[in-house]
Every structure is written in structure tokens, then in C-alpha cells.
């Protein structure tokens, strides 16, 4: 897919674009994002974004292919994924965690696991999960925000 003229969405850009529940140099955790507000989202993600749709529906184009986000849809945008919003319902919303390339390079992950996950989401970046699995993902997000709040520097603590 041709990527000329597409804005790159870095961690800093995401921090300024969204209200954040937590952010650092390497990670942004958003509270509920209203997808309808992302009408000019066409961007090339730098890093990896993992999210889950909570309510409503949104039709987005990912690397030129149409996808529909419904409640309990898990989505992963890999490095250099081109994301374009086409249409979103009034109530479409979800949570996202975005990790920077520097952070991903700093952690040690079993290569076999990483490659299998990466290739699994290349062709289909949106996966419908069971309500119980979605609830589990929401609980993990809440736990992350809680733990990060306890350890966050004072400047970030008020953002959590």
C-alpha cells in the first residue's frame, strides 16, 4: 500500500490527540475513546496499538481493507499499519493501549511467540472475542491504570 502523504501517529501525537488515562515516553493508555471523533484519523501508527471496542459500531479501513468494529472486537494495529476511519455510530467507543517502538525494542519476548502473534494479526487485525474475554481485557486495563497510578511520577499521577 502506498504511504506517501500519510501522517505518522507517534506516542507524542497520540498524547496530544486523546485524553489519556496514563502516558509515559513509551506508552499511552486512553480512557474511553469515542470513535466518531476520529473522523480525520488517517494515519500510519508508529509502534503497536491494542484496543477493544466497548459499544456501537465503526467501519474503518486498515491497510486498504474494510473492517467493522463491533462491541467486544479486539484490534491490533502493528507498526506501519495505515488506519482510516470511514464511518462510526454515535455511541461507538473503546479503549486503546499504544506502545512505542523504543519500548517494544527494550523488552525481551520469545521470538517464536512474537512472530506467530504478529503474523496472526497481519491479515485480520480485528477479532471478535467473547463477552467474558472482553470483560477480562477491560479488567486488565483497569488493573494497569491502578498499578501505574501507584508508581507514576507526580506529573503523570494526575493524568491517571
Question: Locations of the language-model features?
Answer:
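An accessory alpha-helical subdomain
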Residues: 155-160
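Well-ordered beta-strand positions in beta-sheet-rich domains
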Residues: 66-68, 82, 126
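Generic protein-terminus/edge-of-domain signal
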Residues: 1-70
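Conserved hydrophobic/aromatic beta-strand scaffold that supports enzyme active sites
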Residues: 31, 50, 74-76, 96-98, ...
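A short, compositionally biased micro-patch
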Residues: 53-55, 78, 88
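A hydrophobic/aromatic-rich effector-binding and dimerization subdomain
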Residues: 2-23, 86-151
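A short glycine/small-residue-enriched secondary-structure motif
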Residues: 66-78, 114-119
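Histidine-centered metal-chelating micro-motifs
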Residues: 75, 79-85, 104
